[in-house]
Amino acid sequence: MATYSRLTRFLILIGLLNALLIFTTAARAQHPADHWEFSVQTGYLKKVKNNSPFDYRIVPTQAVWRSPTVFNLWQGDSGARLTVRNRFAAVFETFARGPEDYYLAFTAAPSIELWAPDQKTALFYEIGGGAGLLDSKSVPGGQGQNLAFNWFTQAGLRHQLSNTLALTGGVYFTHHSNLGMTSPNPGIDVLGLTVGLVWRLD
């Protein structure tokens, strides 16, 4: 009888541990940072340096993919996390001011995200670059050639509207350059604000 009682308690303990493991795994799988995401982001950028005589104004629209967390830089007992994810984007910029009309590019960057314990709000920082093509014009102070490289950085805030949808807002800076392939090489430096919608893919 004592053996039967011990066996019963053992089986109950195993069942409770298994339920706890399932619950923990399910909770982690629900974290937004552990899923592939797609987002559409747009904004308005103004020239911030005098490297060109043109007063550039750019509207950047991006299709962005973010990977699940690659690794955690830090994880607190409360559930807060500092994560690193991969960010890839197809960029379409329209020039509201300036001799060029558009810029098409691809970019890649790490996305560093500090998540609150409630898994609904995160601060993010991204820094990266890429390359693309614009419709250059033969005018002094313009970009001089179609091939242009880019470097960008962005910091902002995201908030989950639901388990599968989020809203983002940020401060965005980007630099365009042809790396000295033309002389002069005026480049473009613009700074502004962005907003975006994020959808979970899996």
Language-model features and meaning:
Residues 1-33, 202:
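Cleavable N-terminal export/targeting peptides
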Residues 99-122, 127:
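Helix-adjacent hinge/juxtasegments
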Residues 61-63, 188-202:
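Outer-membrane beta-barrel "beta-signal"
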Residues 60-64, 107-109, 152-154, 194:
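Membrane-embedded beta-strand positions in outer-membrane beta-barrel channels/transporters
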Residues 42-48, 67, 90-96, 112-114, ...:
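Transmembrane beta-strands of outer-membrane beta-barrel pores
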